[in-house]
Amino acid sequence: MAQFVRNLVEKTPALVNAAVTYSKPRLATFWYYAKVELVPPTPAEIPRAIQGLKKIVNSAQTGSFKQLTVKEAVLNGLVATEVLMWFYVGEIIGKRGIIGYDV
């Protein structure tokens, strides 16, 4: 047991250095995209979002969504899935657990 602990202590700095070296470029890439993608909308973008929602409601009322190409339908489905998953992640964070609320 003592030899195992000694080997672990000897290898720890090398493992930490390898982990830091491996993760630095990936962390930089993550921060780059996080700063761009996770910013709240500006006041100038809100009217465009409202127009987009009105367009979706209008297409549902008139049935024009049936004229979408397969590519557009798949992209719309992916966006809807992303929105639902972010909602679900927020619920998990709010509940502090995957299943149920603490009562």
UniProtKB/Swiss-Prot annotation:
Record keyword Iron-sulfur present: no
Modified residues (N6-acetyllysine): 11, 24, 35, 54
InterPro entries found in the cross-reference section: ATP_synth_F0_gsu_mt, ATP_synth_su_G_mt_met
Positions bearing N-acetylalanine: 2
GO BP terms: proton motive force-driven ATP synthesis
SUBUNIT field: Component of the ATP synthase complex composed at least of ATP5F1A/subunit alpha, ATP5F1B/subunit beta, ATP5MC1/subunit c (homooctomer), MT-ATP6/subunit a, MT-ATP8/subunit 8, ATP5ME/subunit e, ATP5MF/subunit f, ATP5MG/subunit g, ATP5MK/subunit k, ATP5MJ/subunit j, ATP5F1C/subunit gamma, ATP5F1D/subunit delta, ATP5F1E/subunit epsilon, ATP5PF/subunit F6, ATP5PB/subunit b, ATP5PD/subunit d, ATP5PO/subunit OSCP.
Listed Pfam families: ATP-synt_G
Protein's job: Subunit g, of the mitochondrial membrane ATP synthase complex (F(1)F(0) ATP synthase or Complex V) that produces ATP from ADP in the presence of a proton gradient across the membrane which is generated by electron transport complexes of the respiratory chain. ATP synthase complex consist of a soluble F(1) head domain - the catalytic core - and a membrane F(1) domain - the membrane proton channel. These two domains are linked by a central stalk rotating inside the F(1) region and a stationary peripheral stalk.
TM ranges: none
Predominant place of localization: mitochondrion
Compartment(s) of residence: Mitochondrion; Mitochondrion inner membrane
Organism: Pongo abelii (Sumatran orangutan)
Stated family: Belongs to the ATPase g subunit family.
One GO CC annotation: proton-transporting ATP synthase complex
Alphabetical UniProt keywords: Acetylation, ATP synthesis, CF(0), Hydrogen ion transport, Ion transport, Membrane, Mitochondrion, Mitochondrion inner membrane, Transport
Molecular function GO labels: proton transmembrane transporter activity
Protein name: ATP synthase F(0) complex subunit g, mitochondrial
Source superkingdom: Eukaryota
